[in-house]
Each structure stands twice: as structure tokens, then as C-alpha cells.
Design a protein with these regions (language model features):
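Cytosolic catalytic domains that perform sulfur/thiol-centered chemistry
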Residues: 1-173
């Protein structure tokens, strides 16, 4: 990635998000240290803000507008990372796939790996991204299911269902 940061088709996105118990502020950390040229993908706001549950997928227009505001176009190669190495970047990667953008990758090691490798970071307000051209979200239903879909998969054993929460969260703690 370091040798491709100046490439016009590369869009680097910091999708850091932390659990409340972590006591970390993802936006403040983004402003303090990030991969040069990165834009901040706010998982808290790129969502259906009218839903009772947090972090529900946004509508196609909301995702389109949010992604275009980050300078991401239809032909952009998006590289997503987070401040833990691999935590919330996976959520952003999945959201891009749900909305039809296949040219998305997760940076191995995230920001901690980038820093450990000795690469430069920048701080302060990011350069305002030029609005992305041509990206229009197109929901891909194969990437999402509902309760009935999960029940059917469990009963038919056609899929493996994995709960990726930590053990304490899985146990309701």
C-alpha cells in the first residue's frame, strides 16, 4: 500500500470503531494518527439512524452519499483498516460488498501493523476528499439474511452460522 498511496484509484479508509468498554474515541485517534490520505468511515453514522438498533445497514442512498463524500468512485480500489489491526475494518469491508463495491480489501495488520512496519502517518484534519464519481450503491441480497434465513440454514445444515462476538458479549455480559 505504501508505494500506491499516490495512485488515483486508491482510496484508503479508516473504519475504526471501538466498544464502549474500550474507552477509545475513533475519530480523535484518526485525527491524531492515520495512514496518509486516509478518510474516516464513521460506522456510527453510515447506518440506518432511524432504527431502534445501532449499526443497522443504511439505505442505498445514504451509503452512496457517504461513500461519495469520502472520494470513493465506482472504479476506486478501497483499502480499509482500523486501529486494532482487524476489528471494525471487517464491518466496513462487508458493507462495501453488501452495496456492490467489490474492489475493497482489508489492510493486513491495520494501523498497528502499518506503524510497526515503520511507515509514515499523518495527523490533523484530513484533506477534503474530491467527491467520488460514479459510485451508486446497489444492495446485494446474497450478503444479508434475516431471522428466518438463519433458522432455515440451521435446520438444513446448508450453512455454518458463526457468532463472531467475544465470549463475554456472547454470554450477555
Amino acid at each position: 500500500l505504501s508505494s500506491q498511496l499516490d495512485s488515483p484509484d486508491i482510496s484508503v479508509v479508516d473504519a475504526s470503531w471501538y466498544l464502549p468498554a474500550d474507552g477509545r474515541d475513533s475519530k480523535a485517534e484518526f485525527l491524531a494518527s492515520r495512514i496518509p490520505g486516509a478518510q474516516f468511515f464513521d460506522i456510527d453514522t453510515v447506518a440506518d439512524l432511524d432504527h431502534a438498533c445501532p449499526h443497522m445497514l443504511p439505505s442505498e442512498p445514504v451509503f452512496t452519499q457517504s461513500v461519495q463524500a469520502l472520494g470513493i468512485g465506482a472504479d476506486s480500489r478501497v483499502v480499509v483498516y482500523d486501529g486494532k489491526g482487524l476489528f471494525s475494518a471487517a464491518r466496513a469491508w462487508w458493507m462495501f460488498r453488501v452495496f456492490g463495491h467489490d474492489r475493497v480489501q482489508i489492510l493486513k495488520g491495520g494501523l498497528p501493523g502499518w506503524i510497526a512496519a515503520g511507515y509514515d502517518t499523518e495527523q490533523g484534519e484530513p484533506t477534503v476528499a474530491t467527491s467520488g464519481v460514479g459510485f451508486v450503491a446497489a444492495h446485494q441480497p446474497a450478503w444479508v439474511t434475516d431471522t428466518e434465513g438463519v433458522k432455515a440454514a440451521l435446520s438444513s445444515r446448508s450453512h455454518i452460522v458463526v457468532d463472531a462476538r467475544s465470549c463475554p458479549r456472547f454470554a450477555g455480559e
